[in-house]
Amino acid sequence: MKTSIFKSLYVQVLTAIAIGILLGHFYPELGAQMKPFGDAFVKLIKMVIAPVIFCTVVTGIAGMESMKAVGRTGAVALLYFEVVSTIALIIGLIIVNVVQPGAGMNVDPSTLDAKAVAVYAEQAKDQGVVAFLLDVIPGSVIGAFASGNILQVLLFAVLFGFALHRLGSKGQLIFNVIESFSQVIFGIINMIMRLAPIGAFGAMAFTIGKYGVGTLVQLGQLIICFYITCILFVVVVLGSIARATGFSIFKFIRYIREELLIVLGTSSSESALPRMLDKMEKLGCRKSVVGLVIPTGYSFNLDGTSIYLTMAAVFIAQATNSHMDIFHQITLLVVLLLSSKGAAGVTGSGFIVLAATISAVGHLPVAGLALILGIDRFMSEARALTNLVGNGVATVVVAKWVKELDAKQMDDVLNNRVPANKSHELSS
């Protein structure tokens, strides 16, 4: 039990889920009583939603002040991020509606503990577009954080980030404080994620005990559907963008294969960030472009997370028979265009933003998160891998658009004519 294998969170969660399935199947009544473990984990995740989004967005925007190529490069990068992440959201929405992996589960939302999401209970109501947009503006900043309204926190974070950016060197102290606070928050998240096996065990034992083994088949359909969607997105969407930019997506994937293995092992695209900065520069992208696009992309260009968010949200609606008409789905898309920008490339961040998004939409049962808690860890690999490839492609595209890409060097490196570690570098 003390071997390195059992120290892996991935193995721990896998083991916990297996135990939860067995307990729920053979002792359904006892399995159903394990529900509080899953609820407790969800509450712990909710506890850090507001601060993690605030810190991530503020440091992401204000952090641009230390980079030279902010102007045109920043505008092009943000435009690219918005367009491609929107495409990812739409693709996820379309496929989950076509495949309908949650249809037939017939989960009664009333059996899901609403107390676990009491902070957002008052938002569970329909409202018009005008009322929805006005609700984004908080009555007070403290109130936004106290109520856990993610859109209000996000709006304040964006304004705060831009204001801090305009202060320049005068705001460096504040930036450093927020960045340090952000590290503390992510430290808390890491501690919470260590409890993921317990939460996954409780959620899976309850789900199987309450709804039977057939539920696992439905959850398996969601996992398979999500992985296939991510593969199609990388090959078709990112592949087409890469081809239009002048390189092969398959050769690019081969080039960053070591970074992909790191991400696969950690389920976090952030774990490969330092290596990606170096790799993209050696590929032929100017250092100033790499320094701006890669870090910013970890908050604003998470394609895999975008696909996950739409698919998971609609899956919960299908599983709980919560009707979502075209207005509700458009509202979900609009909310995700905002809230998905607050997801950092770390393990568990997708689940955090999903919880925030569902609560902000106000139409889906937030307690329904317990349905996918047990499998979220297994979807994180596809999220992280897609995010990493997406940010790499974005860097090359932006570099070419702003004419800061050495196309010959990129071609030589991708075709193994010049070793990446010996290719010449472009200085900023």
UniProtKB/Swiss-Prot annotation:
Bilayer topology annotation: Multi-pass membrane protein
Keywords: Cell inner membrane, Cell membrane, Membrane, Symport, Transmembrane, Transmembrane helix, Transport
Chief localization: membrane
Highest taxon above the source species: Bacteria
GO terms, biological process: L-aspartate transmembrane transport
GO cellular component: plasma membrane
UniProt key word Transport: yes
InterPro entries for the chain: C4_dicarb_transport (IPR023954), Na-dicarboxylate_symporter (IPR001991), Na-dicarboxylate_symporter_CS (IPR018107), Na:dicarbo_symporter_sf (IPR036458)
One Pfam family recorded for the sequence: SDF
Compartments, as annotated in UniProt: Cell inner membrane
Protein's UniProt keywords contain NAD: no
A GO MF term: succinate transmembrane transporter activity
Family: Belongs to the dicarboxylate/amino acid:cation symporter (DAACS) (TC 2.A.23) family.
Function: Responsible for the transport of dicarboxylates such as succinate, fumarate, and malate from the periplasm across the membrane.
Protein's name according to its UniProt entry: C4-dicarboxylate transport protein
Organism: Klebsiella pneumoniae (strain 342)
